[in-house]
Amino acid sequence: YYTPKYETKDTDILAAFRMTPQPGVPPEEAGAAVAAESSTGTWTTVWTDGLTSLDRYKGRCYDIEPVAGEDNQYIAYVAYPLDLFEEGSVTNMFTSIVGNVFGFKALRALGLEDLRIPPAYSKTFIGPPHGIQVERDKLNKYGRPLLGCTIKPKLGLSAKNYGRAVYECLRGGLDSTKDDENVNSQPFMRWRDRFVSVAEALFKAQAETGEIKGHYLNATAGTCEEMMKRAAFARESGVPITMHDYLTGGFTANTSLAFYCRDNGLLLHIHRAMHAVIDRQRNHGIHFRVLAKALRMSGGDHVHAGTVVGKLEGERDVTLGFVDLLRDDYIEKDRSRGIYFTQDWVSMPGVFPVASGGIHVWHMPALTEIFGDDSVSQFGGGTLGHPGGNAPGAVANRVALEACVQARNEGRDLAR
């Protein structure tokens, strides 16, 4: 499984693993173990090996390089033949590549840093239900970032008071409001009551402002059937956007919802709740750039991507690296931004990155400069925490955004 002379094919899925072998385990042995366990290998030779062509189907560790400044840590590059994976299934891809190998005894730690998804595989996926340009057309909003707000407190409001907060924020000038990730259907506010109150608030704000408004109605539920029922009710109520927690809900459920949203004209907002459990440790886990690629394949029109400047962790260059992986068609390899492979998405639509978490109007120049127009700035406490109330908070955000966009268009340096 360690084959340093192997020449990768255009159809191979390539993986870059950050590998920390146990003391005494050579990196070549550890890299071979990763390739074997994540493809055709098992702990012994079996008789049925002779009934297939292992040479055709096995993963190959084709390169190993030491990590600069780290003791006994390496980047292992592994190539997987395309035939190992079911078409259009992120679930199967992850089950194969990361399903068992992270518990391997020969490794002290293992991190999946990046994946190269070949066009031959990415073309089998639905991708975002609509994408950046179609969303702008649906909402009739161009030339600036979109502006949103997560309704707070995230838990405890009644449906009526929740709808009131939505109305005040939309009436004040926001493009959309949002359910928090853990707002599903709790005793204090059942989902149907919330959906009805939000729809009423949204239509009232639209009538008074003359702008198209949105709210991300969280359809995440305990079963796929219940999730689809909630998404259908969101469509019937006339709210243009639904929402899913894609890591806690699962990739199979997410892809099913993405198909429904595409077929029924709903935009799909994605929250990454639980991501830090998977991606926060540098040496062990799955980097968010991999989860971002997986989301683009599974389907979502926008996804939370960190802020660089807010309360949640995120390095600027690395964050902008996976923002480009979400939005752009073709992304060149750039190790300084953590991009290990050139990625060609061909014609797959892009995904809006959402900046959210501890941001307020003071951050608006930096957010506008860092993320550009094709992004969503999501202010929760930065709207609802305004001393004058919810509507003045929304007004402040809208005025700040329009001032920053005008200054940028006039050639001002927003970074200063």
UniProtKB/Swiss-Prot annotation:
Residues binding Mg(2+), per UniProt: K178, D180, E181
Main location: plastid
Subcellular location: Plastid, Chloroplast
Active-site residues from the entry: K152, H271
UniProt site positions, description: Transition state stabilizer: K311
GO MF terms, alphabetically ordered: magnesium ion binding; monooxygenase activity; ribulose-bisphosphate carboxylase activity
Cofactor annotation: Mg(2+)
Post-translational changes noted in the entry: The disulfide bond which can form in the large chain dimeric partners within the hexadecamer appears to be associated with oxidative stress and protein turnover.
Family: Belongs to the RuBisCO large chain family. Type I subfamily.
Functional note: RuBisCO catalyzes two reactions: the carboxylation of D-ribulose 1,5-bisphosphate, the primary event in carbon dioxide fixation, as well as the oxidative fragmentation of the pentose substrate in the photorespiration process. Both reactions occur simultaneously and in competition at the same active site.
Protein name: Ribulose bisphosphate carboxylase large chain
Organism, scientific name: Cheiropleuria bicuspis (Fern)
